[in-house]
Amino acid sequence: GEGGAYTKYFFPEQLTFNNYKRLFTETTLLNFPRAFMNTLIISIFSCMISTTFVLSVSYCMSRLRFKMRKPFMNLAMILGLFPAFMSMVAVYFILKAIGLTEGSGLRLALILIYSAGSGTGFYIAKGFFDTVPKSMSEAAILDGCNQFQVFYRIILPLSKPIVVYTILTAFLAPWLDFVFVRVIVGPKDKYWTVSLLLYNMLEKEFVNGWFTR
């Protein structure tokens, strides 16, 4: 077929799966398997940390009563009005100051970025936890359960839909992100994720080798 990113036709002239094979076997110019593994590692660890933070904070806001509860909830709502990338310049310099913008620290830096503010996104899970009858928690406490046991053995099993939703969103956010990866990783192709690698496929030295071939 025609080479390049743009062609004269909309539908492909022939059906082939060779490009999927090439994507994982031809690594001389762009190493897709490495980018895929980088993305998978970052997404899995970010998902684990974020899910733990979100569900824990949601339970605290739903079931516990403490002095700064309302101000914290209001602050979290206000912070949620601003997109995360507004802070990326400050975040970059903080990471640079602690040495996480070079080498293997880049993966850790991205995991920290995606996980750090996840706890403020607790409103949806909190709303679901609010629907679980408090009488069940109170009965468990009377039977000798502590707060962790109530959370782990009663609330979570009754909240499987919101747990699955939290896991999916916590995984997809780093998997699909481009802006922070572009700023933090930059030209260091060893630590590219899939989104950054796909973006670089459009560079003039790569475009003819990957599109409509």
Residue ranges and their predicted role:
Residues 1-213:
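A structural signal for multi-pass alpha-helical bundles of membrane permease subunits
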